[in-house]
Amino acid sequence: MMTTVKTVDGVLPVKPMSYVLSDDWTYMYSDDWKGVDFNVYACMNGEVVAVVEV
């Protein structure tokens, strides 16, 4: 299991989908790194995380 991924926004922590399932989170974009597809989400508090697609 990856704990971080490298994105255009820098190295982001990987979190489960349940972590971003509130109204405070906004989907930003999809990307891949080392063959792993993930989505990037941003929170109203400034936190940015990646959610790996399963």
Where in the sequence are the language-model features?
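Acidic, low-complexity, intrinsically disordered interaction modules
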Residues: 12-54
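A short beta-strand micro-motif
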Residues: 3-8
